[in-house]
UniProtKB/Swiss-Prot annotation:
One of its GO terms (molecular function) is ferredoxin-NADP+ reductase activity. This is Ferredoxin--NADP reductase, leaf isozyme, chloroplastic. InterPro entries: FAD-bd_FR_type, Flavoprot_Pyr_Nucl_cyt_Rdtase, FNR, FNR_nucleotide-bd, FNR_plant_Cyanobacteria, OxRdtase_FAD/NAD-bd, Riboflavin_synthase-like_b-brl. Its main location: plastid. NADP(+) binds at S142, K162, T218, V250, P251, S280, R281, K290, G319, L320, E358. The keyword Transit peptide applies. Pfam families: NAD_binding_1 (PF00175). The lineage of its organism: Eukaryota, Viridiplantae, Streptophyta, Embryophyta, Tracheophyta. Belongs to the ferredoxin--NADP reductase type 1 family. Its cofactor is FAD. Pathway: Energy metabolism; photosynthesis. FNR is probably attached to the membrane by a specific binding protein. Changing Y360F: Results in a 2.0-fold reduction in kcat for the diaphorase reaction.
């Protein structure tokens, strides 16, 4: 920490110590300190008394520049008590009839009033009241559309929502409040929106980056937003020339979300987009093990590890929390071959914004 010294020196008018003294401000570099007395200094052969004030100056603050597209990002523009009220424009089931559960893709109007970015989330406040007679609390959902929306006019926002229905320990069928509210919405219905929120999952700025996306189920939402911007849109300030590699894990092939869209992207940019599905109830690896997302990744383990050593590789993980441990297990053994502690290395990646996780 830098120090600044201001010295006030009291000197007699002459060499006589009986004469009055005067105080002068003297530059520190002109002072010669005498060992015989901490209070005395000599200036041009004259002895005087010094009073010095030492102040410290805080070091200049280092401004951290994010590697992500965070310029002018907006968060929490709309709160639960004053949400934005949009309308449902489109609500379509995107899973097959034999899929274990329903997933819906929905588009809401925003009229440009909810300025979100790829990788952010919005909150939804479902209609009605809870068992205590209070309004329902908001639920957060990852945005499934790019910043300009599915219609390309920056006036809509899209979600990918799985209908939650389960049987509790008492044998009662329980329906998730918000997911069922959303999946049942009809075009024209009003929907209360909060946010946008989140900076963890923002896209990298570098258009030449390697972006590895690991998603399960509706965790595909932020990656759809990334990939639309990369391959379906034209931007003057962004043209993706790197590698986007998507791993998507689902239980059945009828649960593969946005499959046709992703295949079109791969056809359009085969050198820049790689696509790998892991269908756990239908596929197995060469050991006969079910094909979970980490099982599929293990087939490319060495290649993935080499990519993770580069400072322009960014990993994004979104979906079920269970996949995180499976992926760590793969990386632990790979890193160990190079004498690297994976958990410590992952901390380094997180600090560098290269390992980004949003699981539930």
């Amino acid at each position: 920490m830098a120090a600044a010294v201001t010295a006030a020196v009291s000197l007699p008018y002459s060499n006589s110590t009986s004469l009055p003294i005067r105080t002068s401000i003297v530059a520190p570099e002109r002072l010669v300190f005498k060992k015989v007395s901490l209070n005395n200094v000599s200036i041009s052969g004259r002895v005087g008394t010094i009073r010095a004030q030492v102040t410290t100056e805080a070091p200049a603050k280092v401004v951290k520049h994010s590697k992500k597209q965070d310029e002018n990002i907006v968060v929490n523009k709309f709160k639960p008590k004053e949400p934005y009220v949009g309308r449902c424009l489109l609500n379509t089931k995107i899973t097959g009839d034999d899929a274990p559960g329903e997933t819906w893709h929905m588009v809401f109007s925003t009229e440009g009033e909810v300025p979100y970015r790829e990788g952010q989330s919005i909150g939804i406040v479902p209609d009605g009241i809870d068992k205590n007679g209070k309004p329902h609390k908001l639920r957060l959902y990852s945005i499934a559309s790019s910043a300009i929306g599915d219609f390309g006019d920056s006036k809509t926002v899209s979600l990918c929502v799985k209908r939650l229905v389960y049987t509790n320990d008492a044998g009662e069928v329980v329906k998730g409040v918000c997911s069922n509210f959303l999946c049942d919405l009809k075009p024209g219905s009003e929907v209360k929106i909060t946010g946008p929120v989140g900076k963890e999952m923002l896209m990298p700025k570098d258009p030449n980056a390697t972006v590895i996306m690991l998603g399960t189920g509706t965790g595909i939402a932020p990656f759809r937003s990334f990939l639309w911007k990369m391959f379906f849109e034209k931007h003057e300030d962004y043209q993706f020339n790197g590698l986007a590699w998507l791993f998507l894990g689902v239980p059945t092939s009828s649960s593969l979300l946005y499959k046709e869209e992703f295949e079109k992207m791969k056809e359009k940019a085969p050198e820049n987009f790689r696509l790998d599905f892991a269908v756990s109830r239908e596929q197995v690896n060469d050991k006969g093990e079910k094909m979970y997302i980490q099982t599929r990744m293990a087939q490319y383990a060495e290649e993935l590890w080499e990519l993770l050593k580069k400072d322009n590789t960014f990993v994004y993980m979104c979906g079920l929390k269970g996949m995180e441990k499976g992926i760590d297990d793969i990386m632990v053994s790979l890193a160990a071959k190079d004498g690297i502690d994976w958990i410590e290395y992952k901390r380094t990646l997180k600090k560098a914004e290269q390992w980004n996780v949003e699981v539930y």
